[in-house]
Amino acid sequence: MKQNAGMYGIKLFAAVLLSLALTACQSSGDRLTVVNPDVSRTGTQTDQSPDPAPGGERKLTVVKTPEQQVDRELTVARTHRIEAASIQSWLSEDEVSIETTKLVKAGTATEEPKYEYTSSIVNINTGQSRKNTGEGGQQVKGYMLVKETISPDGSYSFIQKWKDKYIADNFVKNLQTGQTIQIKGDNYLERGGWLNADTYILAAGSMSGRGEIRQISAADGKVTAVTLDDPDAEMFGQFGASHGRIYYTDDQHVLKVFEPGQAKPVSLIQDVWSFEISPDSQYIAVSTVTQSGEFKGSKLLIYDAAGSLQGSLIGKGDLISYISWSPDSAKLAFDVYTEDKTGMNGVYIFDTRSGRVLPLAQYYAAGDPMPHPVYPFSWSPSGNRLGFTLDDPKSLLVTHVIDFK
């Protein structure tokens, strides 16, 4: 469920405080390639020294682009702006279901402000809107919210219909036949993922403790309990599944992996704040928060499915949040918050094809302070468009949609 946009600052402060308890474990000497949009079109950039900084810290580095790679660089083609709204879902490459927020009554010292919410459908290209008659699958009679996750081969979908903030009914739908099977048992968490093409893994959660891990057969809806022997995981900080493996973070922020039938997990990465598995299951984007003597901030790194570091440091700042893969796994969006104005700050895109990082701040930020997304990123079906919502002093919220080419 979405949270109030004003909670971002509170969450950010809490995240920084929590990060002070973590310990550093990363190696030194990695490089970061950041593309300056103004000069990337010409193929020339400043080449800075890649030598590690004193004390073993990674040094953020801009490298020169070979001429033959210029035509493969990711660039921004166009931007769009939707006032007072957030994206609920993409109905197609050009249409989005949005929720518009209107302040009805200002808050006082004793009363919370009151808002009015309306749903509509907007064409990104024309800006024209129409009434939402239930498209997008976000709401169904008797439920507050409906979420759907498609299997890797597109044959099935796992559907969660939330009765309220805490309890959901679960279903598996055969997208070829249209048959829907209800899965036994309530759940209290949204966390899960496709283990393979026809098996869904659900971290059901519980009002006390971590709850069950359920292995669900998409073909017949059969549920099998998955055993995990890990005393350090009273709750799951993060949870996901891919390519026959189940990934999660324990109470000590260690990313671990195990396979159904093997109850003992293997530790992969320490100091993990969040992680996202790419849709093609090839990579894991990991946001770490480390501390060694003094607060060292957050770093974004890419690992393969086995937990081996792949390539360079992708991002660095005081806090990295909302990491999100495009549907085709070609791009990774993330937001960086940094107090130091000379560091990375704002929304960035990592292009997996070129290995470059593209800053987007110039396309949505007019000046200081740097605005940051208040809800998770939203990708179009093709991955060629990215939507994100910011606080706005005039319209409460504003959603930007960036077109890539």
For each feature predicted by the language model, list its residue ranges.
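Sec-dependent N-terminal signal peptides of Gram-positive bacterial secreted proteins and lipoproteins
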Residues: 2-32
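Sequence signature of WD/YWTD-type beta-propeller architectures
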Residues: 25-405
